[in-house]
Amino acid sequence: GLAAGLPPEQQIAARLAAQGFDLLIPAIISRDKLETEDARTQQADMTQREWIYRQAFHMGRHVIGYDVQRILGAVDWFAQNKPATAKIGMVGYGEGGLLALHAAAIDPRIDVTLISGYFNSSEAIWSEPIYRNVWRRSLSLGNAEVAALVMPRTLLIEHSEFPLVTGHKGDLSTPAKESVRAEFERIRYEQNDAPRQLFVEKNDEPTTRWSDETFTAFLNRFDLKPSEGTVAFDSDRRADAVARIAERKARCVRQAEEHVQSLVQQSEHVRDKFFLYNVKPEWQERPWSTDKSHAIEKPETFIAAAADYRRKFATEAMGRFDLSLASPNARTRKVAETELWTAYDVVLDVHDSLFAWGTLVIPKNMKPEERRPVVVCQHGRNGVPRDTIDNHTTAYNDFAAKLAERGFVTYAPHNLYRGEDQYRWLDRKANAIGCTLFSFIIAQHDQTLTWLSTLPFVDGDRIAFYGLSYGGETAVRVPPILEKYCLSICSGDFNQWTRKVASTDQPFSFMRTIEWEMPYWNLGHSFDYAEMTYLMFPRPFMVERGHHDGVGRDQWVAHEFAKVRYLYAQFGMSDRVDIEFFQGGHSINGQGTFDFLHKHLNWPAPDSEQ
Protein backbone atom coordinates (compact mmCIF):
# COMPACT_ATOMS: atom_id res chain seq x y z
CA GLY A 1 0.00 0.00 0.00
CA LEU A 2 3.04 2.30 -0.11
CA ALA A 3 4.82 0.87 -3.12
CA ALA A 4 5.89 3.13 -5.94
CA GLY A 5 3.96 2.63 -9.16
CA LEU A 6 0.62 1.84 -7.56
CA PRO A 7 -2.30 4.09 -8.51
CA PRO A 8 -3.17 6.45 -5.63
CA GLU A 9 -6.48 4.69 -4.93
CA GLN A 10 -4.65 1.38 -4.43
CA GLN A 11 -2.17 2.84 -1.93
CA ILE A 12 -4.29 1.68 0.97
CA ALA A 13 -1.66 2.42 3.61
CA ALA A 14 -1.27 6.00 2.41
CA ARG A 15 -5.03 6.48 2.32
CA LEU A 16 -5.40 5.16 5.86
CA ALA A 17 -2.56 7.34 7.11
CA ALA A 18 -4.28 10.35 5.56
CA GLN A 19 -7.31 9.52 7.70
CA GLY A 20 -5.19 9.61 10.85
CA PHE A 21 -4.69 5.88 11.40
CA ASP A 22 -1.55 4.61 13.07
CA LEU A 23 -0.24 1.84 10.83
CA LEU A 24 1.80 -1.27 11.48
CA ILE A 25 2.53 -3.32 8.36
CA PRO A 26 3.96 -6.76 9.26
CA ALA A 27 6.41 -8.40 6.91
CA ILE A 28 5.22 -11.87 5.91
CA ILE A 29 6.89 -14.80 4.18
CA SER A 30 7.07 -14.02 0.49
CA ARG A 31 5.79 -16.07 -2.41
CA ASP A 32 8.92 -15.06 -4.33
CA LYS A 33 11.01 -17.90 -5.71
CA LEU A 34 13.41 -19.47 -3.23
CA GLU A 35 16.94 -18.37 -4.05
CA THR A 36 19.46 -21.17 -3.58
CA GLU A 37 22.76 -22.32 -5.00
CA ASP A 38 21.91 -25.99 -4.41
CA ALA A 39 21.22 -27.59 -7.80
CA ARG A 40 18.77 -30.20 -6.48
CA THR A 41 16.76 -27.61 -4.57
CA GLN A 42 16.66 -25.45 -7.69
CA GLN A 43 15.07 -28.35 -9.58
CA ALA A 44 12.39 -28.59 -6.88
CA ASP A 45 11.29 -25.10 -8.01
CA MET A 46 9.98 -23.77 -4.70
CA THR A 47 8.77 -20.42 -3.48
CA GLN A 48 9.81 -19.14 -0.08
CA ARG A 49 6.33 -19.93 1.22
CA GLU A 50 6.52 -23.52 -0.03
CA TRP A 51 9.96 -23.92 1.54
CA ILE A 52 8.48 -23.16 4.96
CA TYR A 53 5.21 -24.98 4.26
CA ARG A 54 6.93 -28.31 3.50
CA GLN A 55 8.99 -28.54 6.65
CA ALA A 56 6.38 -26.95 8.92
CA PHE A 57 3.41 -29.08 7.79
CA HIS A 58 5.17 -32.28 8.82
CA MET A 59 5.76 -30.79 12.27
CA GLY A 60 2.18 -29.67 12.86
CA ARG A 61 2.90 -26.04 11.98
CA HIS A 62 1.99 -23.95 8.95
CA VAL A 63 3.37 -21.03 7.00
CA ILE A 64 -0.06 -19.42 7.41
CA GLY A 65 0.22 -19.88 11.17
CA TYR A 66 3.65 -18.24 11.34
CA ASP A 67 2.37 -15.19 9.47
CA VAL A 68 -0.77 -15.00 11.60
CA GLN A 69 1.48 -14.98 14.68
CA ARG A 70 3.30 -11.96 13.25
CA ILE A 71 -0.02 -10.20 12.77
CA LEU A 72 -1.10 -11.02 16.31
CA GLY A 73 2.20 -9.58 17.49
CA ALA A 74 1.20 -6.31 15.82
CA VAL A 75 -2.17 -6.48 17.58
CA ASP A 76 -0.33 -7.02 20.88
CA TRP A 77 1.66 -3.83 20.28
CA PHE A 78 -1.44 -1.74 19.59
CA ALA A 79 -3.28 -3.23 22.57
CA GLN A 80 -0.37 -2.36 24.86
CA ASN A 81 0.39 1.11 23.52
CA LYS A 82 -3.01 2.60 22.68
CA PRO A 83 -5.97 3.59 24.84
CA ALA A 84 -8.31 0.75 25.73
CA THR A 85 -11.10 2.52 23.85
CA ALA A 86 -9.14 2.65 20.59
CA LYS A 87 -10.42 0.31 17.92
CA ILE A 88 -8.08 -1.98 16.02
CA GLY A 89 -8.68 -2.58 12.34
CA MET A 90 -7.02 -4.84 9.81
CA VAL A 91 -6.92 -4.85 6.03
CA GLY A 92 -5.38 -7.42 3.70
CA TYR A 93 -5.25 -8.23 0.01
CA GLY A 94 -4.58 -11.61 -1.62
CA GLU A 95 -2.39 -13.61 0.74
CA GLY A 96 -2.83 -10.74 3.17
CA GLY A 97 -6.59 -11.19 2.90
CA LEU A 98 -6.26 -14.86 3.82
CA LEU A 99 -4.12 -13.94 6.82
CA ALA A 100 -6.41 -11.11 7.89
CA LEU A 101 -9.45 -13.40 7.85
CA HIS A 102 -7.74 -16.06 9.95
CA ALA A 103 -6.18 -13.58 12.38
CA ALA A 104 -9.54 -11.91 12.95
CA ALA A 105 -11.18 -15.29 13.55
CA ILE A 106 -8.61 -16.03 16.26
CA ASP A 107 -8.20 -12.67 18.01
CA PRO A 108 -11.31 -10.85 19.32
CA ARG A 109 -9.27 -7.67 19.85
CA ILE A 110 -9.51 -7.01 16.11
CA ASP A 111 -12.66 -4.90 15.78
CA VAL A 112 -12.92 -4.34 12.04
CA THR A 113 -11.51 -6.49 9.23
CA LEU A 114 -11.43 -5.70 5.53
CA ILE A 115 -10.25 -8.36 3.08
CA SER A 116 -9.89 -7.99 -0.67
CA GLY A 117 -8.87 -10.34 -3.46
CA TYR A 118 -9.22 -13.50 -1.40
CA PHE A 119 -12.70 -14.64 -0.33
CA ASN A 120 -14.17 -17.55 -2.29
CA SER A 121 -15.66 -21.02 -1.92
CA SER A 122 -13.33 -23.53 -0.26
CA GLU A 123 -14.50 -26.47 -2.38
CA ALA A 124 -11.51 -26.17 -4.71
CA ILE A 125 -8.95 -25.18 -2.11
CA TRP A 126 -6.88 -28.17 -3.26
CA SER A 127 -6.20 -26.32 -6.55
CA GLU A 128 -4.66 -23.29 -4.86
CA PRO A 129 -0.89 -22.94 -4.28
CA ILE A 130 0.56 -25.74 -2.16
CA TYR A 131 1.37 -23.39 0.71
CA ARG A 132 -2.39 -22.95 1.24
CA ASN A 133 -2.89 -26.68 1.86
CA VAL A 134 -4.55 -27.09 5.27
CA TRP A 135 -5.24 -30.54 6.70
CA ARG A 136 -8.98 -31.38 6.85
CA ARG A 137 -9.89 -27.84 5.80
CA SER A 138 -12.86 -28.82 3.62
CA LEU A 139 -14.45 -30.94 6.35
CA SER A 140 -15.12 -28.22 8.87
CA LEU A 141 -13.54 -24.84 8.24
CA GLY A 142 -14.23 -23.38 4.83
CA ASN A 143 -13.96 -19.63 4.40
CA ALA A 144 -17.58 -19.16 5.48
CA GLU A 145 -17.00 -21.03 8.73
CA VAL A 146 -13.83 -19.05 9.45
CA ALA A 147 -15.69 -15.83 8.68
CA ALA A 148 -18.42 -16.82 11.13
CA LEU A 149 -15.78 -16.88 13.87
CA VAL A 150 -15.22 -13.16 13.29
CA MET A 151 -18.84 -12.39 14.19
CA PRO A 152 -20.19 -10.27 15.85
CA ARG A 153 -17.25 -8.05 14.95
CA THR A 154 -17.23 -6.32 11.58
CA LEU A 155 -16.10 -8.19 8.48
CA LEU A 156 -16.00 -6.39 5.13
CA ILE A 157 -15.32 -8.50 2.04
CA GLU A 158 -14.38 -6.85 -1.23
CA HIS A 159 -14.57 -8.98 -4.36
CA SER A 160 -11.68 -7.51 -6.34
CA GLU A 161 -9.35 -9.11 -8.85
CA PHE A 162 -7.29 -11.86 -7.21
CA PRO A 163 -3.51 -11.83 -7.62
CA LEU A 164 -2.66 -13.98 -10.63
CA VAL A 165 -0.45 -16.85 -9.47
CA THR A 166 0.59 -19.83 -11.59
CA GLY A 167 3.08 -22.66 -11.20
CA HIS A 168 3.10 -22.77 -7.39
CA LYS A 169 1.88 -26.39 -7.25
CA GLY A 170 -1.50 -24.73 -7.62
CA ASP A 171 -2.83 -21.51 -9.09
CA LEU A 172 -4.83 -18.43 -8.18
CA SER A 173 -7.26 -16.60 -10.44
CA THR A 174 -10.29 -14.42 -9.89
CA PRO A 175 -13.34 -16.58 -9.18
CA ALA A 176 -16.80 -16.10 -10.62
CA LYS A 177 -19.06 -13.76 -8.67
CA GLU A 178 -21.56 -16.57 -8.06
CA SER A 179 -18.96 -18.58 -6.17
CA VAL A 180 -18.00 -15.64 -3.97
CA ARG A 181 -21.59 -14.66 -3.26
CA ALA A 182 -22.59 -18.25 -2.44
CA GLU A 183 -19.75 -18.56 0.09
CA PHE A 184 -20.67 -15.19 1.59
CA GLU A 185 -24.27 -16.32 2.04
CA ARG A 186 -23.05 -19.38 3.94
CA ILE A 187 -21.62 -17.23 6.74
CA ARG A 188 -23.77 -18.17 9.70
CA TYR A 189 -24.44 -15.98 12.70
CA GLU A 190 -27.27 -16.25 15.18
CA GLN A 191 -28.32 -12.63 14.67
CA ASN A 192 -29.74 -11.53 11.32
CA ASP A 193 -28.01 -8.16 11.50
CA ALA A 194 -24.53 -9.67 11.55
CA PRO A 195 -22.04 -6.91 10.69
CA ARG A 196 -20.77 -8.35 7.44
CA GLN A 197 -20.82 -6.84 3.97
CA LEU A 198 -19.85 -7.99 0.49
CA PHE A 199 -18.76 -5.38 -2.05
CA VAL A 200 -18.96 -6.01 -5.79
CA GLU A 201 -19.56 -3.80 -8.81
CA LYS A 202 -23.17 -3.13 -9.74
CA ASN A 203 -22.83 -5.56 -12.64
CA ASP A 204 -21.55 -8.13 -10.16
CA GLU A 205 -18.07 -8.01 -11.65
CA PRO A 206 -14.99 -7.71 -9.41
CA THR A 207 -14.68 -4.23 -8.02
CA THR A 208 -11.58 -2.07 -8.12
CA ARG A 209 -9.25 -2.93 -5.27
CA TRP A 210 -9.94 -0.66 -2.28
CA SER A 211 -12.91 0.98 -4.00
CA ASP A 212 -14.34 4.19 -2.55
CA GLU A 213 -17.45 2.32 -1.40
CA THR A 214 -15.42 -0.27 0.47
CA PHE A 215 -13.01 2.28 1.91
CA THR A 216 -15.87 4.47 3.13
CA ALA A 217 -17.58 1.51 4.79
CA PHE A 218 -14.34 0.72 6.62
CA LEU A 219 -13.99 4.31 7.81
CA ASN A 220 -17.60 4.41 8.97
CA ARG A 221 -16.85 1.61 11.42
CA PHE A 222 -14.42 4.01 13.09
CA ASP A 223 -16.90 6.91 12.92
CA LEU A 224 -14.78 8.58 10.24
CA LYS A 225 -15.57 10.09 6.87
CA PRO A 226 -13.24 10.23 3.85
CA SER A 227 -11.04 13.32 3.82
CA GLU A 228 -10.63 15.41 0.73
CA GLY A 229 -6.85 15.39 0.58
CA THR A 230 -4.30 12.63 0.08
CA VAL A 231 -0.91 11.96 1.58
CA ALA A 232 2.00 11.41 -0.77
CA PHE A 233 4.65 8.93 0.35
CA ASP A 234 7.97 7.95 -1.05
CA SER A 235 8.25 4.16 -0.88
CA ASP A 236 11.34 4.56 1.32
CA ARG A 237 13.72 7.49 1.58
CA ARG A 238 16.66 5.48 2.86
CA ALA A 239 19.42 4.84 0.36
CA ASP A 240 19.63 1.19 1.41
CA ALA A 241 15.86 0.61 1.34
CA VAL A 242 15.96 -2.13 -1.29
CA ALA A 243 18.61 -4.06 0.62
CA ARG A 244 16.73 -3.61 3.90
CA ILE A 245 13.51 -4.92 2.40
CA ALA A 246 15.32 -7.94 0.94
CA GLU A 247 16.95 -8.66 4.29
CA ARG A 248 13.62 -8.34 6.07
CA LYS A 249 12.08 -10.90 3.71
CA ALA A 250 15.02 -13.24 4.19
CA ARG A 251 14.79 -12.83 7.96
CA CYS A 252 11.12 -13.85 7.92
CA VAL A 253 12.04 -17.09 6.17
CA ARG A 254 15.07 -17.67 8.37
CA GLN A 255 13.13 -17.18 11.60
CA ALA A 256 10.41 -19.64 10.59
CA GLU A 257 12.96 -22.18 9.38
CA GLU A 258 14.96 -21.95 12.59
CA HIS A 259 11.83 -22.59 14.63
CA VAL A 260 10.75 -25.57 12.53
CA GLN A 261 14.23 -27.07 12.65
CA SER A 262 14.25 -26.75 16.43
CA LEU A 263 11.04 -28.81 16.42
CA VAL A 264 12.70 -31.40 14.17
CA GLN A 265 15.65 -31.70 16.55
CA GLN A 266 13.42 -32.18 19.61
CA SER A 267 10.69 -34.25 17.97
CA GLU A 268 12.13 -37.61 19.01
CA HIS A 269 11.33 -36.85 22.65
CA VAL A 270 7.81 -35.73 21.75
CA ARG A 271 7.16 -38.97 19.88
CA ASP A 272 8.53 -41.04 22.77
CA LYS A 273 6.13 -39.37 25.17
CA PHE A 274 3.27 -39.69 22.70
CA PHE A 275 3.62 -43.45 22.22
CA LEU A 276 6.26 -45.60 23.89
CA TYR A 277 6.55 -43.82 27.24
CA ASN A 278 2.83 -43.29 27.39
CA VAL A 279 2.26 -47.03 27.09
CA LYS A 280 5.34 -48.02 29.13
CA PRO A 281 6.08 -45.05 31.44
CA GLU A 282 8.45 -47.17 33.53
CA TRP A 283 10.82 -47.35 30.56
CA GLN A 284 11.41 -43.61 30.50
CA GLU A 285 13.67 -43.41 33.56
CA ARG A 286 15.29 -46.78 34.06
CA PRO A 287 17.83 -47.07 36.88
CA TRP A 288 21.50 -47.71 36.20
CA SER A 289 22.15 -51.44 36.05
CA THR A 290 25.17 -53.73 36.01
CA ASP A 291 23.08 -56.89 35.83
CA LYS A 292 24.15 -59.31 33.16
CA SER A 293 20.54 -59.92 32.16
CA HIS A 294 17.12 -58.45 32.78
CA ALA A 295 13.75 -60.12 33.02
CA ILE A 296 11.62 -60.50 29.92
CA GLU A 297 8.32 -58.65 30.14
CA LYS A 298 4.90 -59.90 29.12
CA PRO A 299 3.67 -58.26 25.91
CA GLU A 300 -0.10 -58.32 26.43
CA THR A 301 -0.39 -54.80 27.86
CA PHE A 302 1.64 -53.27 25.06
CA ILE A 303 -0.25 -55.17 22.35
CA ALA A 304 -3.59 -54.01 23.76
CA ALA A 305 -2.46 -50.38 24.00
CA ALA A 306 -0.95 -50.44 20.51
CA ALA A 307 -4.38 -51.20 19.07
CA ASP A 308 -5.50 -47.66 19.93
CA TYR A 309 -2.38 -46.20 18.34
CA ARG A 310 -3.04 -48.32 15.26
CA ARG A 311 -6.46 -46.72 15.00
CA LYS A 312 -4.97 -43.24 15.45
CA PHE A 313 -2.34 -43.90 12.81
CA ALA A 314 -4.92 -45.21 10.37
CA THR A 315 -7.53 -42.50 10.86
CA GLU A 316 -5.58 -39.42 11.97
CA ALA A 317 -2.23 -39.80 10.22
CA MET A 318 -2.91 -41.75 7.02
CA GLY A 319 -6.64 -41.06 6.79
CA ARG A 320 -9.37 -43.58 6.15
CA PHE A 321 -12.38 -43.46 3.85
CA ASP A 322 -15.60 -44.29 5.65
CA LEU A 323 -16.66 -46.73 2.96
CA SER A 324 -17.27 -50.46 2.87
CA LEU A 325 -15.29 -52.55 0.44
CA ALA A 326 -17.11 -53.59 -2.70
CA SER A 327 -17.32 -57.20 -3.84
CA PRO A 328 -13.88 -57.95 -5.39
CA ASN A 329 -15.34 -59.09 -8.73
CA ALA A 330 -11.89 -60.39 -9.73
CA ARG A 331 -10.88 -60.31 -13.41
CA THR A 332 -7.74 -62.16 -14.49
CA ARG A 333 -5.66 -62.82 -17.60
CA LYS A 334 -2.46 -64.78 -18.15
CA VAL A 335 0.44 -62.44 -19.00
CA ALA A 336 3.64 -64.48 -18.61
CA GLU A 337 4.90 -68.02 -18.14
CA THR A 338 8.17 -69.86 -17.54
CA GLU A 339 9.04 -73.46 -16.75
CA LEU A 340 8.63 -72.69 -13.05
CA TRP A 341 5.68 -70.28 -12.75
CA THR A 342 2.71 -68.65 -14.45
CA ALA A 343 1.76 -64.98 -14.01
CA TYR A 344 -1.70 -63.44 -14.18
CA ASP A 345 -2.84 -59.83 -14.14
CA VAL A 346 -5.63 -59.31 -11.62
CA VAL A 347 -8.15 -56.46 -11.33
CA LEU A 348 -10.30 -56.03 -8.20
CA ASP A 349 -13.09 -53.59 -7.40
CA VAL A 350 -12.50 -51.61 -4.18
CA HIS A 351 -14.92 -48.66 -4.05
CA ASP A 352 -16.93 -46.86 -6.71
CA SER A 353 -14.35 -45.52 -9.21
CA LEU A 354 -11.47 -47.11 -7.27
CA PHE A 355 -9.99 -50.45 -8.26
CA ALA A 356 -6.86 -52.40 -7.42
CA TRP A 357 -4.70 -54.39 -9.79
CA GLY A 358 -1.52 -56.39 -9.76
CA THR A 359 0.21 -59.50 -11.04
CA LEU A 360 -0.14 -62.89 -9.36
CA VAL A 361 2.73 -65.37 -9.81
CA ILE A 362 1.90 -69.03 -9.11
CA PRO A 363 4.58 -71.74 -8.88
CA LYS A 364 3.96 -74.74 -11.13
CA ASN A 365 5.03 -77.42 -8.66
CA MET A 366 2.05 -77.05 -6.35
CA LYS A 367 0.31 -80.17 -5.06
CA PRO A 368 -3.48 -80.62 -5.08
CA GLU A 369 -5.15 -78.91 -2.10
CA GLU A 370 -1.81 -77.46 -0.99
CA ARG A 371 -1.93 -74.02 0.64
CA ARG A 372 1.22 -71.97 0.34
CA PRO A 373 2.46 -68.72 1.88
CA VAL A 374 2.24 -65.52 -0.19
CA VAL A 375 4.77 -62.71 -0.48
CA VAL A 376 3.29 -59.41 -1.65
CA CYS A 377 6.12 -57.75 -3.62
CA GLN A 378 5.71 -53.97 -3.86
CA HIS A 379 7.28 -51.74 -6.50
CA GLY A 380 8.47 -48.20 -5.82
CA ARG A 381 7.80 -44.74 -7.23
CA ASN A 382 6.85 -44.72 -10.92
CA GLY A 383 7.02 -48.50 -11.00
CA VAL A 384 4.62 -51.17 -12.22
CA PRO A 385 4.08 -54.75 -11.00
CA ARG A 386 6.12 -56.39 -13.77
CA ASP A 387 9.18 -54.43 -12.61
CA THR A 388 9.37 -56.88 -9.71
CA ILE A 389 8.95 -59.96 -11.92
CA ASP A 390 10.67 -59.97 -15.29
CA ASN A 391 11.88 -56.51 -16.28
CA HIS A 392 15.43 -57.41 -15.19
CA THR A 393 16.21 -54.11 -13.42
CA THR A 394 19.11 -53.83 -10.98
CA ALA A 395 16.83 -52.25 -8.39
CA TYR A 396 14.25 -55.04 -8.19
CA ASN A 397 16.31 -57.99 -9.46
CA ASP A 398 13.06 -59.79 -10.38
CA PHE A 399 12.56 -60.63 -6.72
CA ALA A 400 8.89 -61.59 -7.09
CA ALA A 401 9.83 -64.19 -9.71
CA LYS A 402 12.80 -65.45 -7.69
CA LEU A 403 10.60 -65.94 -4.65
CA ALA A 404 8.09 -67.83 -6.79
CA GLU A 405 10.93 -70.06 -7.95
CA ARG A 406 11.54 -70.80 -4.27
CA GLY A 407 7.98 -72.01 -3.91
CA PHE A 408 6.18 -68.92 -2.64
CA VAL A 409 3.06 -67.60 -4.29
CA THR A 410 3.85 -63.95 -5.00
CA TYR A 411 1.63 -61.01 -5.79
CA ALA A 412 2.90 -57.69 -7.13
CA PRO A 413 0.25 -54.99 -6.56
CA HIS A 414 0.17 -51.67 -8.35
CA ASN A 415 0.37 -48.68 -6.02
CA LEU A 416 -0.83 -45.24 -7.09
CA TYR A 417 2.47 -43.35 -6.89
CA ARG A 418 3.04 -43.30 -10.65
CA GLY A 419 2.90 -40.35 -13.01
CA GLU A 420 4.72 -37.87 -10.78
CA ASP A 421 2.47 -34.85 -10.12
CA GLN A 422 -0.65 -36.77 -11.16
CA TYR A 423 -0.58 -38.80 -7.96
CA ARG A 424 0.57 -35.79 -5.94
CA TRP A 425 -2.61 -33.96 -6.87
CA LEU A 426 -4.58 -36.97 -5.67
CA ASP A 427 -2.82 -36.70 -2.32
CA ARG A 428 -3.45 -32.95 -2.26
CA LYS A 429 -7.19 -33.39 -2.82
CA ALA A 430 -7.30 -36.05 -0.13
CA ASN A 431 -5.59 -33.75 2.40
CA ALA A 432 -8.56 -31.40 2.25
CA ILE A 433 -10.75 -34.11 3.80
CA GLY A 434 -8.18 -35.51 6.23
CA CYS A 435 -6.89 -38.24 3.94
CA THR A 436 -3.71 -38.99 1.99
CA LEU A 437 -2.46 -41.03 -0.93
CA PHE A 438 -2.24 -43.96 1.46
CA SER A 439 -5.96 -43.75 2.16
CA PHE A 440 -6.45 -45.16 -1.34
CA ILE A 441 -3.55 -47.60 -1.09
CA ILE A 442 -4.64 -49.05 2.26
CA ALA A 443 -8.13 -49.71 0.90
CA GLN A 444 -6.64 -51.39 -2.18
CA HIS A 445 -4.43 -53.63 -0.06
CA ASP A 446 -7.29 -54.46 2.27
CA GLN A 447 -9.29 -55.71 -0.70
CA THR A 448 -6.27 -57.53 -2.10
CA LEU A 449 -5.69 -59.38 1.17
CA THR A 450 -9.34 -60.37 1.35
CA TRP A 451 -9.23 -61.75 -2.19
CA LEU A 452 -5.90 -63.56 -1.78
CA SER A 453 -7.25 -65.32 1.30
CA THR A 454 -10.07 -66.82 -0.77
CA LEU A 455 -7.73 -68.57 -3.22
CA PRO A 456 -7.68 -72.35 -2.62
CA PHE A 457 -3.88 -72.56 -2.91
CA VAL A 458 -3.17 -69.67 -0.48
CA ASP A 459 -2.67 -69.90 3.27
CA GLY A 460 -4.42 -66.71 4.42
CA ASP A 461 -2.52 -66.73 7.71
CA ARG A 462 0.85 -66.55 5.92
CA ILE A 463 0.71 -63.45 3.72
CA ALA A 464 3.88 -61.36 3.96
CA PHE A 465 4.84 -57.95 2.58
CA TYR A 466 8.17 -56.97 0.97
CA GLY A 467 8.61 -53.59 -0.69
CA LEU A 468 11.40 -51.45 -2.14
CA SER A 469 11.65 -47.65 -2.07
CA TYR A 470 8.10 -46.21 -2.04
CA GLY A 471 7.21 -49.88 -1.63
CA GLY A 472 9.39 -49.83 1.49
CA GLU A 473 7.50 -46.76 2.62
CA THR A 474 4.36 -48.82 2.11
CA ALA A 475 5.92 -51.56 4.26
CA VAL A 476 5.83 -49.36 7.37
CA ARG A 477 2.39 -47.89 6.69
CA VAL A 478 0.11 -50.59 5.30
CA PRO A 479 1.08 -53.79 7.21
CA PRO A 480 1.11 -51.97 10.56
CA ILE A 481 -2.54 -51.07 9.90
CA LEU A 482 -3.66 -54.24 8.11
CA GLU A 483 -2.97 -57.07 10.51
CA LYS A 484 -3.72 -59.69 7.86
CA TYR A 485 -0.10 -59.14 6.82
CA CYS A 486 1.79 -61.59 9.01
CA LEU A 487 5.18 -59.88 8.53
CA SER A 488 6.75 -56.94 6.70
CA ILE A 489 10.12 -56.21 5.06
CA CYS A 490 11.14 -52.61 4.36
CA SER A 491 13.84 -52.31 1.69
CA GLY A 492 15.52 -49.14 0.48
CA ASP A 493 13.44 -46.81 2.60
CA PHE A 494 13.74 -47.31 6.38
CA ASN A 495 14.84 -44.02 7.85
CA GLN A 496 14.71 -41.41 10.52
CA TRP A 497 11.64 -40.16 8.68
CA THR A 498 11.21 -36.78 10.33
CA ARG A 499 14.67 -35.73 9.21
CA LYS A 500 14.07 -37.34 5.83
CA VAL A 501 11.04 -35.14 5.24
CA ALA A 502 11.58 -31.94 7.17
CA SER A 503 15.28 -31.35 7.89
CA THR A 504 17.10 -28.70 5.90
CA ASP A 505 20.61 -29.85 6.87
CA GLN A 506 20.52 -33.46 5.65
CA PRO A 507 21.63 -34.24 2.07
CA PHE A 508 19.01 -37.00 1.73
CA SER A 509 16.07 -34.80 2.75
CA PHE A 510 12.93 -34.44 0.65
CA MET A 511 13.32 -30.69 1.18
CA ARG A 512 15.68 -30.86 -1.81
CA THR A 513 13.45 -32.87 -4.17
CA ILE A 514 10.32 -32.52 -6.29
CA GLU A 515 8.33 -34.77 -3.94
CA TRP A 516 6.08 -32.14 -2.43
CA GLU A 517 3.49 -34.70 -1.26
CA MET A 518 5.83 -36.17 1.37
CA PRO A 519 4.90 -33.97 4.35
CA TYR A 520 2.12 -35.57 6.42
CA TRP A 521 0.33 -33.38 8.94
CA ASN A 522 2.18 -33.43 12.29
CA LEU A 523 3.66 -36.88 11.62
CA GLY A 524 6.96 -35.63 13.01
CA HIS A 525 5.38 -35.34 16.45
CA SER A 526 3.52 -38.65 16.38
CA PHE A 527 4.78 -41.45 14.14
CA ASP A 528 8.30 -41.85 12.81
CA TYR A 529 9.45 -45.24 11.50
CA ALA A 530 10.03 -46.64 14.98
CA GLU A 531 6.50 -45.77 16.08
CA MET A 532 5.02 -47.12 12.85
CA THR A 533 6.94 -50.36 13.34
CA TYR A 534 5.80 -50.65 16.96
CA LEU A 535 2.39 -51.29 15.39
CA MET A 536 3.82 -54.41 13.72
CA PHE A 537 4.65 -56.00 17.08
CA PRO A 538 4.63 -58.93 17.72
CA ARG A 539 4.65 -59.76 14.00
CA PRO A 540 8.12 -60.15 12.38
CA PHE A 541 9.73 -57.12 10.75
CA MET A 542 12.97 -56.68 8.80
CA VAL A 543 14.96 -53.87 7.17
CA GLU A 544 17.13 -54.27 4.07
CA ARG A 545 19.68 -51.47 3.73
CA GLY A 546 22.36 -50.89 1.10
CA HIS A 547 25.36 -48.93 2.37
CA HIS A 548 25.36 -46.87 -0.83
CA ASP A 549 21.63 -46.18 -0.92
CA GLY A 550 21.20 -42.40 -1.13
CA VAL A 551 17.72 -42.60 0.35
CA GLY A 552 19.33 -42.16 3.76
CA ARG A 553 22.45 -42.59 5.84
CA ASP A 554 23.40 -45.76 7.73
CA GLN A 555 23.71 -43.96 11.05
CA TRP A 556 20.15 -42.64 10.95
CA VAL A 557 18.75 -45.96 9.71
CA ALA A 558 20.51 -47.79 12.54
CA HIS A 559 19.43 -45.15 15.04
CA GLU A 560 15.75 -45.63 14.23
CA PHE A 561 15.99 -49.40 13.91
CA ALA A 562 17.62 -49.69 17.34
CA LYS A 563 14.38 -48.47 18.91
CA VAL A 564 12.45 -51.21 17.15
CA ARG A 565 14.84 -53.95 18.21
CA TYR A 566 14.80 -52.66 21.78
CA LEU A 567 11.02 -53.04 21.90
CA TYR A 568 11.04 -56.59 20.58
CA ALA A 569 13.91 -57.53 22.91
CA GLN A 570 12.06 -56.39 26.05
CA PHE A 571 9.38 -58.93 25.28
CA GLY A 572 11.79 -61.71 24.39
CA MET A 573 11.11 -61.55 20.66
CA SER A 574 14.32 -60.13 19.22
CA ASP A 575 14.44 -63.13 16.88
CA ARG A 576 11.43 -61.67 15.09
CA VAL A 577 13.18 -58.48 14.02
CA ASP A 578 16.28 -58.09 11.87
CA ILE A 579 18.29 -55.71 9.69
CA GLU A 580 20.71 -56.52 6.89
CA PHE A 581 23.31 -54.05 5.66
CA PHE A 582 24.88 -54.95 2.33
CA GLN A 583 27.52 -53.43 0.07
CA GLY A 584 25.08 -52.10 -2.49
CA GLY A 585 22.66 -49.32 -3.31
CA HIS A 586 18.93 -48.77 -3.74
CA SER A 587 18.26 -52.39 -4.56
CA ILE A 588 16.70 -55.68 -3.50
CA ASN A 589 19.58 -57.78 -2.16
CA GLY A 590 17.51 -60.91 -1.61
CA GLN A 591 19.84 -62.65 0.83
CA GLY A 592 18.98 -62.15 4.48
CA THR A 593 15.45 -61.12 3.55
CA PHE A 594 14.83 -64.38 1.68
CA ASP A 595 16.10 -66.31 4.71
CA PHE A 596 13.79 -64.23 6.89
CA LEU A 597 10.81 -65.14 4.71
CA HIS A 598 11.61 -68.84 4.73
CA LYS A 599 11.99 -68.80 8.50
CA HIS A 600 8.89 -66.86 9.47
CA LEU A 601 6.60 -68.17 6.73
CA ASN A 602 7.67 -71.69 7.64
CA TRP A 603 8.59 -72.60 4.09
CA PRO A 604 11.74 -74.65 3.33
CA ALA A 605 14.59 -72.99 1.48
CA PRO A 606 15.88 -74.64 -1.72
CA ASP A 607 17.97 -77.75 -1.09
CA SER A 608 21.16 -76.00 -2.23
CA GLU A 609 20.84 -73.57 0.70
CA GLN A 610 20.01 -76.07 3.42
PLM features per residue range, with description:
Residues 1-79, 93, 120-129, 367-454, ...:
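Cap/lid segment of the alpha/beta-hydrolase catalytic domain
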Residues 4, 18-22, 54-63, 108, ...:
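Alpha/beta-hydrolase-fold serine-hydrolase catalytic core, especially in secreted/extracellular enzymes
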Residues 27, 91, 116-117, 158, ...:
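Alpha/beta-hydrolase-fold catalytic nucleophile elbow
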Residues 33-74, 177-181, 190, 264-269, ...:
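Accessory cap/linker subdomain of secreted extracellular hydrolases
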Residues 69, 73-149, 450-523:
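Primarily recognizes the serine-hydrolase "nucleophile elbow" in alpha/beta-hydrolase
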